[in-house]
Amino acid sequence: MWIQVRTMDGKVAHTVDSLSRLTKVEELRKKIQELFHVEPGLQRLFYRGKQMEDGHTLFDYDVRLNDTIQLLVRQSLVLPVPVPSSSGGSKERDSELSDTDSGCGLAQSESDKSSNSGEAANEPEGKADEDECDETELGLYKVGEYVDARDTNMGAWFEAKVIRVTRKAPAHDQPSSSSSKPEDDIIYHVTYDDYPENGVVQMTSQNVRARARHTIKWEDLQVGQVVMVNYNPDLPKDRGFWYDAEILRKRETRTARELHANVRIGGDSLNDCRIVFVDEVFKIERPGEGNPMVENPMRRKSGPSCKHCKDDERKLCRMCACHVCGGKQDPDKQLMCDECDMAFHIYCLRPPLSSVPPEEEWYCPDCRIDSSEVVQAGEKLKESKKKAKMASATSSSQRDWGKGMACVGRTKECTIVPSNHFGPIPGIPVGTMWRFRVQVSESGVHRPHVAGIHGRSNHGAYSLVLAGGYEDDVDHGNSFTYTGSGGRDLSGNKRTAEQSCDQKLTNTNRALALNCFAPINDLKGAEAKDWRSGKPVRVVRNVKGRKHSKYAPIEGNRYDGIYKVVRYWPEKGKSGFLVWRFLLRRDDVEPGPWTKEGKDRIKKLGLTMQYPEGYLEALARKEKENSKQAALDKEEEDGEEGFTSPRKGKRKSKSAGGDGSSRGTPKKTKVEPYSLTTQQSSLIKEDKSNMKLWTEILKSLKDGPKFLSKVEETFQCICCQELVFRPITTVCQHNVCKDCLDRSFKAQVFSCPACRYDLGRSYAMTVNQPLQAVLSQLFPGYGSGR
């Protein structure tokens, strides 16, 4: 196993090989020291946002093959010579290495402290500006008068009552200006009629005016007039709050009256908004026009604060009241969650609280994060319940199982088709070869790392590996007899064992039996009359089957095409126990890779053995080290022989280029171009909106199977990172899945996900049918499960 280690700035990177999943972090530090020349004590290693600590293994951090670990080098501080002070003491600096040395610490720097102290010094001046002087008979509106107060965040006007009037004291460093109005220094302390829980709110004179009390009739409304209307910016057809608006136009028909206005929301304006409630247009009261309103006035209608219960006090509501019981009683005993903004009675919590906690922030049980579960920098990992149940956790064996390629885990996953896909994988021709089983899993041909059959007992088998693990297997190439799984004791994390009991037609055995085009029979088995109508099974042959079959590959794993189950039956195997046998026969249009036609096709397609990324480089480094060690050992042996016997004459060494020049440069194999059907070519021509992309893609036809990879890369959805399904080709020439664009519009994002071009709220999503049709033909079955 090998991984990549890279410095945090990305300038230096090295490959660390000869590792195991059970390699300790402290052992990894020693290997990093050899490559980066950094002492283990100065290394900070990060993987997936976690700081790796000694005492854990790579398996604990789930480090996989060819993953990247970041290295941050701590600063090595040198102790200065102590300087004696006038008081006889000495100034000492802490030599201890800390996380702040690397620039990632939480400690406060001196500059931060000085800046904070400056803020603290300026704080009394800010408070001095906000000092208020209580006076009587101030302002236009007196104590007890009903007014309209504007919420500065929403820009809407709410009904309120004046509780107190004060004057703001002038600032010490700001002389009074003769141009300023006396009303500008007045502060009104008001309470909202509908929101008493907000308490007393301070308002400047610009945000307070006389209570609107006169409605304007339809006949008296004029264009350009500024009035107060009810409007809902989020849902324009519903009742909302009260805003100032300038009338643009009005139109009256026999059945309806339309009023359009520019609604003023704070400093912004919503243009050309249709006002629904045309009978509730209020005149804006100017100062001094009417008598002060000190008696309880008529209330205006506003939109309900809760859309679920419509502010009905008799209804239980878990959205605006207690999220547990839905009751609206005891508001003083409710807590608001600072994360989800839901209310909870203190006696509805489990366990209940006796009183309201004094903390400013409070989180409900669903939003609360248990601090004991958080792994902070420098702390050990918490015990994993999942890994504690693994067989490797309870095994007493000292064997290092972490070096096997079956244990490294997948670095990528096949998403072009779902895991329960029957039939061939698009872009994987017959004869494709992989060095390790984990690569076969990554390609999607056979997903399990170790198991021989991939399937579900209620659906069928999707693929199997013929590896010669059972002595009862018989391989004839175009057909073979496969032995079912089970009947072996694999406790203790074993990969294989001798047959120790009878097999049963359950689990994957039953899944493989379901592929046979015949009714299931748990006792005697069954045989299909029309075997070609059965479900297809992808078959992979492994090099281990070479001991039983001449059709197995010489190296690694090879995809041999589609087979169908002809019959299955139980019989006593060579071990003396009952085993289930399955007869499979090849049903694939592509020739078998062991035939002459198949071998020629493999050459034409340019199919070669596929290795994991970095495998050949790691192998070359290992061979280089072994050759160096062998050369050193030989020199030592030659030196010892020199003292005992005379050296023999050296043979003339070959020139470096002598042998290679005779052979010359190997001839490059010509790859068979990928051929499109007539229907596929016509569909590509119909897709005029993507003609530029197709022109570039069609240049890859000469590369054979790589053409499909080019198509998949070009038509990848930027949202889900998958091949586009039901594609929408936008006006800006980008292709997005319809479902992805629907989710974007539901989130009120009406722009192209790729370039942020404004598509508009009313954008018509039309599926590009020619593109969808050609993708479905190139990648059959890729839309299943999407």
From Swiss-Prot:
Q: In chain numbering, where does the site feature Required for affinity and specificity for 5-mCpG sequence fall? A: 495
ZnF (RING-type) residues = 717-756
Report which reactions are catalysed by this protein. Answer: S-ubiquitinyl-[E2 ubiquitin-conjugating enzyme]-L-cysteine + [acceptor protein]-L-lysine = [E2 ubiquitin-conjugating enzyme]-L-cysteine + N(6)-ubiquitinyl-[acceptor protein]-L-lysine
PROSITE patterns per the UniProt record, alphabetical:
UBIQUITIN_2, YDG, ZF_PHD_1, ZF_PHD_2, ZF_RING_1, ZF_RING_2
What ranges does the record give for the region Required for formation of a 5-methylcytosine-binding pocket, renumbered to this chain?
470-473, 482-485
- Where does this protein reside within or beyond the cell? Nucleus
**SUPFAM superfamilies for the chain:** FYVE/PHD zinc finger (SSF57903), PUA domain-like (SSF88697), RING/U-box (SSF57850), Ubiquitin-like (SSF54236)
Post-translational modification N6-acetyllysine, affected residues? 403, 550
Q: Which UniProt keywords apply?
A: Acetylation, Cell cycle, Chromatin regulator, DNA damage, DNA repair, DNA-binding, Isopeptide bond, Metal-binding, Nucleus, Phosphoprotein, Repeat, Repressor, Transcription, Transcription regulation, Transferase, Ubl conjugation, Ubl conjugation pathway, Zinc, Zinc-finger
Annotated site (Required to confer preferential recognition of cytosine over thymine)? 483
Region Tudor-like 1: start-end pairs: 139-213
Tell me which residues bind DNA: 467-468, 473
Where are the residues of the annotated region Histone H3R2me0 binding?
A: 337-341, 357-359
User: What are the boundaries of the PHD-type zinc fingers?
Assistant: 303-370
- The site annotation (Histone H3R2me0 binding) covers 331, 334
- Give the free-text PTM comment from the record: Phosphorylation at Ser-302 of the linker region decreases the binding to H3K9me3. Phosphorylation at Ser-645 by CDK1 during M phase impairs interaction with USP7, preventing deubiquitination and leading to degradation by the proteasome. Ubiquitinated; which leads to proteasomal degradation. Autoubiquitinated; interaction with USP7 leads to deubiquitination and prevents degradation. Ubiquitination and degradation takes place during M phase, when phosphorylation at Ser-645 prevents interaction with USP7 and subsequent deubiquitination. Polyubiquitination may be stimulated by DNA damage.
- Asked if the Swiss-Prot or TrEMBL record annotates the protein with the keyword Iron-sulfur, the reply is no
State the protein's purpose: Multidomain protein that acts as a key epigenetic regulator by bridging DNA methylation and chromatin modification. Specifically recognizes and binds hemimethylated DNA at replication forks via its YDG domain and recruits DNMT1 methyltransferase to ensure faithful propagation of the DNA methylation patterns through DNA replication.
Q: What does its UniProt record remark on the domains?
A: The tudor-like regions specifically recognize and bind histone H3 unmethylated at 'Arg-2' (H3R2me0), while the PHD-type zinc finger specifically recognizes and binds histone H3 trimethylated at 'Lys-9' (H3K9me3). The tudor-like regions simultaneously recognizes H3K9me3 through a conserved aromatic cage in the first tudor-like subdomain and unmodified H3K4 (H3K4me0) within a groove between the tandem subdomains.
Protein name in UniProt = E3 ubiquitin-protein ligase UHRF1
Q: Which organism is it from?
A: Bos taurus
Q: What's the source species' lineage? A: Eukaryota, Metazoa, Chordata, Craniata, Vertebrata
Gene name on record? UHRF1
